[in-house]
Amino acid sequence: MILLEINNRIIEETLLVKYRNAQAGLKPESIDIRIADFDGVLYHISNVNGDKTKVRISISLKFYKQLQEHGADELLKREYGSLLTDTEEGYNVSVLINLEEIPEDCEQIAKRIGLLKRNCFASVFEKYFDYQEQGEEGQKRAVINYRNDETLYVEAKPDRVTVVFSTIFRDEDDVIIGKVFMQELREGRRASHTAPQVLFSHREPPLELANTDARVGDNIGYVTFVLFPRHTNKETRDNTINLIHMFRDYLHYHIKCSKAYIHSRMRAKTSDFLKVLNRARPEPKNTEKKTITGRTFKRID
């Protein structure tokens, strides 16, 4: 299985090129790039007021207001500090790099900016991991509508944090492949005693979402992760967040890859079958004959 990168490689590499060109003394060039990411996230890389030495990176998330309720602004201040700048119109967060003042850790800065989406998501997980660590119970469940008609639920208890993703399967085939994929995850957990418990429910929401407005339907699936203190403590939580916030994209990416592989195998088998049929086709009878003098004639039966 393929693990998707948690950072946006286009942003990271674009900023690294800008830094390296500036370090080499090359004249800065203007930039105006818009980039789409998973979950409807949009980025915009541009110059501020036409100044080619000032590069602004902005991110837009449809669900950012819901993340703000769980400390997204505070987490971004902690992660980006002085890099934060006035937010570009139409976006939620903006950071600024100055090509006239290149820091020694410019590569790390480019990597951190490439993690903007991940760090926005991280706020809700860190908040509920802290609730669990402090033994707080009875806190309101977090509800993040991270995609159209798809929702993330996070709830903390003294001994665990439960994370539930709702997702929509666009095709009946997707449901079947999704079930097989989730079965593989459950089988994989048997080989690793430190892996979290993973549950999958189709059509009906899990018991954790009983008496809520969670959707019901033939194309609805719910994936539940049960995270224990070994997954949420200070030493391991960053890796847990890295993996879990991308899970929905990871699931659907592998569903699409599986379908593409099945289709390619079907096309290959069809091609092989056609070759067999073509070899079995009888050769047309040649009824044209020649006389001893070299003249030709066709025999008509």
UniProtKB/Swiss-Prot annotation:
Gene: Arpc2
Stated family: Belongs to the ARPC2 family.
Biased composition (Basic and acidic residues): 281-291
Assembly, per entry: Component of the Arp2/3 complex.
Source organism: Drosophila melanogaster
Protein name: Actin-related protein 2/3 complex subunit 2
Known function: Functions as actin-binding component of the Arp2/3 complex which is involved in regulation of actin polymerization and together with an activating nucleation-promoting factor (NPF) mediates the formation of branched actin networks. Seems to contact the mother actin filament.
Tree of life domain: Eukaryota
Primary site of residence: cytoplasm
Region annotation Disordered: where it falls in the sequence: 281-301
A Gene Ontology biological process term: cell projection assembly
Any matching Pfam family: P34-Arc
Keyword Cytoplasm: yes
